[in-house]
Amino acid sequence: MSNDRPMEPSIASAAQLAKLLRATGYLADDALATIGFLALRLGRPLLLEGEPGTGKTALAEALAEALDLPLIRLQCYEGIDASQALYDWDFPRQILHLRALETTARIGEGGDGADGPDVEKSLFDERFLLARPILRALRESPAVLLVDEVDRADDEFEAFLLEVLSTYQVTIPELGTIRATVPPIVILTSNRTRELHDALKRRCLYHWIDHPGLARELEIVRSRAPEVGERLSRQVVSAVQAMRRGDDLVKPPGVAETLDWARALMELGASDLDVEHASATLGVAVKYREDADRVRASLDTILGA
């Protein structure tokens, strides 16, 4: 049974959400603000896909800050399974506890430490439970749960996620069923290294995030790196936009690289992005040797864009 619920009416419109996000330094366009607002109002997970560096993870961070909620992050990777997302038992502490019970039983000639069922019950007490991100999000809600790079996980983990997101509850055999009093706000991100299953997509609202255009990216730099001069900011953003227009880079720079590049140039005292400064700091913007070689070979064209 679905546990969807509309969010409390604290955010009345997409425009209000965009304003709250802007106050954290995150500039959402109208489409993203609208789908984010609908996800909050309808109580549905939001799946964000896009190239690396387009601000998918940053949206979850900004949303948690804007709503004054804890951010709980589940970083997906190849081979992740349900136990690594849900919970585990603190085995070393359980062993110490068991030894303490045995010692108590010997000294007291019986007592609680000698009772088998009681021993087992005490071993699987909540004090020995290691809550992983999903269980934490269910127990600590309201919270923002970020399931980052879900495309790196496998089909089995996707099926597990779908079940959790359908019920917002998990069952721990030794403790029973744990339900979220208020379901967490769930943001899933994917770099689309593989296609996600339709069942998971149907469960979520969906939005593709593109790299920002020149005007919006310049606005982001002004907001996030106000210490960088206007002229240098424009030159950096123009250069990054030119790099992205080509289709020959392994990984075009994202917004994070734009910000880092602008700040790095400022630290070097550069007031203009010329060929010398660009070549010396290229490793801030591009992270593959072949990309650096291609960009360096065409810097005159890129800087003149």
Give the residues covered by each predicted segment.
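C-terminal regulatory/interaction module of P-loop NTP-utilizing enzymes
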Residues: 1-305
